[in-house]
Design a protein with these regions (language model features):
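Conserved C-terminal alpha-helix-loop-beta "cap" of PLP-dependent enzymes
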Residues: 284-466
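Charge-dense polyanion-binding interfaces
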Residues: 463-480
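Short, glycine-/Ser/Thr-/acidic-enriched flexible segments
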Residues: 27, 162, 217-218, 233-235, ...
Length: 480
């Protein structure tokens, strides 16, 4: 029987699956004024302003955002943090210029590099052997790169990372500003940070010039809603506004903007109480999970001060399966099939549960009880060879880059079998999504290690995206 999207969603919403994934409203926050979105879905009619030339109600709404977040200026993003990244990078660089960016940046950053025909230089986070999580970016690495590449026009860091790892933004911003260039921080996963001392400080509090946040990821706002904040004088507001108009829809959704405003109003009036109660629930859940015997809750003190990690966002609940008889994908399946708990992300050796201020006491209890029950049935036997192979890591290096992303993507290509592509120059991205961090970008050479990694991901049942071939059996490479 044919099933339509709206019917499928409605049916799903009536089920028992609990969301430990974004959006941050967790399907439990709906202001009275938003209960019927069709009633408020309008265009730029009299009295309702224009996002691309805000002078009235939308300008005032964005001013309230700036006041709440202590920014000089704040902008609504109705095309998500993707639009913010595209706009920020474009505003801070010249066509054909250079950017220094963390390798674990979101794919939207790479799209900006392509569109602006930039030369990208990468900062590589170290990997924690115990958990296979990416670490942070060190101030020393930033300083060294800026010394080697004085032509760099902007620096882009992701902090917190998808897994909650926070870099030393205060030290990095000081270094970047000494070179008279702006620091852009992709804080898509950190819109909630400033509302509780339980969490790390926001990049806005530590000197970043542009900070991009996804409201919908960790706060009660609709999917696709985000914010861009600016401070200081290193970024041209005129250029930024120009690119925001280019990358954002000319028909911005008033439903989305109403959702953002409702979220901001809630934070203005009740953030102190809401976050106090939330952090109590979160800490109790983490306390229970600290009793796991075989599975392992990744704790803040395990990562902070190591591999470039300055702090960790403990709202991200990371459960490591390393050294047990279960892998990340099988744990995710058990949590969903038996306990009706949907995780945010799975990796070969861990799962990530994303919590938010809207998570209930019951939800946290269900997660803790389920993991403790699964844990009690496990043993600590080492995994078989397939599991060990799946956990082989790739160490990214600059030597694999042959030419720029734009040069490669605009060149002639041919499609070859992935297993026969060693030594060829890729014209495609390849990444696991989530979190969307590329293991190869156009212009880089396909290595034996990369091929083995992709094959192992496929064996684990993980989805490799970015390649035109959805099955990741073929890859497009530069034509000889």
């Amino acid at each position: 029987m044919k099933k339509y999207i709206d019917e499928a969603l409605y049916e799903y919403s009536k089920g028992e699956v609990y969301p430990f994934h974004m959006p941050g409203h967790k399907r439990s926050f709906c202001p009275e004024t938003l209960k019927n979105p069709y009633e408020i879905d309008i265009t730029e009619i009299t009295g309702f302003d224009n996002l691309h030339h805000a002078e009235g109600i939308l300008l005032e709404a964005q001013k309230r955002v700036a006041k709440l977040y202590h920014a000089d200026k704040s902008f609504y993003l109705i095309n998500g943090s993707t639009a913010g990244l595209l706009s920020a990078i474009s505003a801070c660089t010249s066509d054909g210029g250079s950017i220094l960016m963390a390798r674990n940046c979101h794919k939207a950053a790479y799209h900006a590099v392509y569109l602006r025909r930039l030369h990208a230089h990468y900062l590589y986070p170290a990997v924690f052997e115990e958990t296979e999580l990416n670490g942070g970016i060190t101030p020393k690495a930033v300083e060294e790169a800026l010394s080697v590449y004085p032509e760099i026009e902007a620096v882009l860091i992701t902090s917190p990372s998808y897994d909650g790892m926070v870099s030393d933004i205060a030290a990095i911003s000081e270094i970047v500003h000494a070179h008279q260039i702006p620091l852009i921080v992709d804080e898509a996963h950190g819109a909630h940070l400033r509302f509780s001392d339980t969490f790390p400080e926001s990049a806005l509090e530590n000197g970043a010039d542009i900070v991009i946040q996804s409201l919908h990821k960790t706060l009660p706002s609709l999917t696709q809603t985000a914010l861009l904040h600016t401070q200081g004088s290193l970024v041209s507001e005129e250029r930024l506004k120009r690119f925001l108009s280019i990358y954002q829809s000319s028909s911005p959704s008033y439903v989305f903007m109403s959702s953002m405003d409702a979220c901001i109003r809630l934070l203005e009036s009740s953030s102190e109480v809401l976050f106090k109660e939330y952090t109590v629930r979160l800490k109790e859940c983490r306390r229970k999970l600290s009793e796991l015997k075989y599975l392992h809750l990744v704790e803040t003190d395990e990562v902070v001060g190591k591999n470039g990690v300055y702090d960790m966002d403990c709202s991200k609940i990371i459960i490591s399966t390393k050294g047990t008889s279960i892998d990340g994908e099988r744990l995710r399946e058990k949590l969903l099939d038996k306990y009706q708990l949907e995780m945010e992300m799975t990796a070969p050796s861990y799962v990530l549960a994303l919590s938010s201020v809207m998570d209930s006491e019951e939800g946290f209890a269900r997660l803790a009880d389920a993991l403790l029950e699964i844990d009690s049935a496990l043993d600590s036997e080492m995994e078989n060879q397939m599991k060990e192979k799946a956990q082989t890591k790739i160490e990214f290096t600059d030597e694999d880059a042959i030419c720029t992303i734009a040069e490669t993507m605009d060149a002639e290509w041919e499609e070859v079998n992935l297993k026969e592509a060693e030594g060829r120059v890729s014209t495609e991205f390849a990444y696991l999504y989530p979190p969307g961090i590329p293991c190869i970008v156009p212009g880089e050479m396909v290595t034996k290690e990369l091929i083995e990694k992709i094959e192992s991901w496929k064996m684990q049942g993980l989805e490799v995206q970015g390649l035109i071939d959805y099955h990741a059996q073929k890859i497009r490479v530069q034509k000889r």
